[in-house]
A protein has these predicted regions:
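Residue-level detector of flexible, active-site-proximal loop/helix-junction positions
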Residues: 20, 125, 255-257
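Residue-level detector of conserved, well-ordered beta-strand and adjacent loop positions
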Residues: 5, 14, 254
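Conserved HGGG/HGGXW glycine-rich cap/lid loop of the alpha/beta-hydrolase fold
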Residues: 16-63
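N-terminal cap/lid segment of alpha/beta-hydrolase-fold proteins
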Residues: 1-10
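Conserved strand-loop elements at the edges of beta-sheets that form or border functional pockets
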Residues: 6, 18, 262
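Flexible "cap/lid" subdomain of the alpha/beta-hydrolase fold that forms the substrate-access gate
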Residues: 9-11, 31, 36, 52, ...
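Catalytic histidine-centered segment of alpha/beta-hydrolase-like enzymes
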Residues: 256-265, 269
Length: 281
């Protein structure tokens, strides 16, 4: 399939690998798209896995509602659920990066019975992240989350008059992305209201139920974190396993930035394959 639906919304999706292979769903983060997983997908499909990577809510042109409330976390979870149902699989391996990690943590807590394994990258369990916000320098590293609550400031900071995508590209490069990947993502963010839609993930955060963030995860989990990540600091990453009531493995990438799937796709793929093999569908 190249699209799937959740209600009236239509999502673009990469569907690669053997149709009868174990299913892996990969959820991208901000400000990226499904092709941020391409190098990982190539290696997973070579080992017989079927990989599904959607352009998520706000990133797919056919799934770009205008209201902030339409980007609440339960709705992001429902998008993943619709994709997993559309795959025909009873259970899948679920992988996320950045905001995709936030979504997959929430999915694992809502629908653990549909998952064989969970593999979030960069963003730890939400309870660990929230505690780090309150007790460490994570608060200062997350300044942009607070700035993104304003109606126009993030767009102005990142795109200037709306066409100056190089501003965003420079910020991404400063955080460890290659110039090629940063230019690619920034140019797409400058098109057709994409940035405003993507930022609504942040703006809808305050509309959620805080208690849902403290639910303990019961799915076998491997958490990936680069110790040079400028956005997700050690306090939350190192505490992540405290909130997982299942087999847990922490993979620290020494010298790794925030952008692990594209920065180190070979190692990411190797570790994912090990994790999947330990918890087969």
């Amino acid at each position: 399939m190249d699209t799937f639906r959740n209600g009236d919304l239509v999502f673009d999706v990469t569907d690669a690998g053997p149709a009868d292979g174990p299913v892996v769903v990969l959820a991208h983060g901000f400000p990226q798209f499904k092709d941020s997983w391409d190098e990982v997908i190539t290696q997973l499909t070579a080992q017989g896995y079927r990989c599904l990577a959607p352009n998520q809510r706000g990133y797919s042109p056919g799934a770009r509602p205008s209201r902030r409330r339409d980007y609440r976390l339960p709705l992001l979870v429902s998008d993943l659920h619709a994709l997993i149902d559309a795959s025909g699989a009873d259970k899948v391996h679920l992988v996320g990066h950045d905001w995709g990690s936030v979504a997959v943590w929430a999915y694992a807590n809502a629908h653990p019975e549909r998952l064989a394994s969970l593999s979030p990258m960069a963003v730890p369990h939400p309870a660990a992240f929230l505690k780090a916000l309150a007790t460490s320098n994570q608060f200062f590293s997350s300044w942009y989350i607070y700035a993104f609550q304003t109606p126009w400031l993030p767009e102005r900071i990142m795109l200037g008059d709306g066409t100056q995508w190089h501003k965003l590209s420079k910020r991404l490069q400063d955080s460890g992305q290659t110039r090629r990947n940063a230019d690619r993502d920034a140019q797409r963010m400058a098109q057709d209201g994409t940035l405003t839609a993507a930022v609504k993930w942040y703006r809808a955060m305050l509309l959620g139920n805080p208690k849902s963030f403290t639910t303990r995860t019961t799915v076998p989990t491997m958490f990936f974190w680069g110790d040079q990540d400028q956005f997700c600091k050690p306090a939350g990453a190192l505490a992540c396993g405290n909130y997982v009531d299942a087999p847990y493995r922490f993979e620290r990438f020494y010298g790794g930035s925030h952008w692990l799937p594209e920065e180190q796709p070979d190692l990411v793929s190797k570790l994912l394959l090990e994790h999947f093999a330990n918890y087969p569908v």
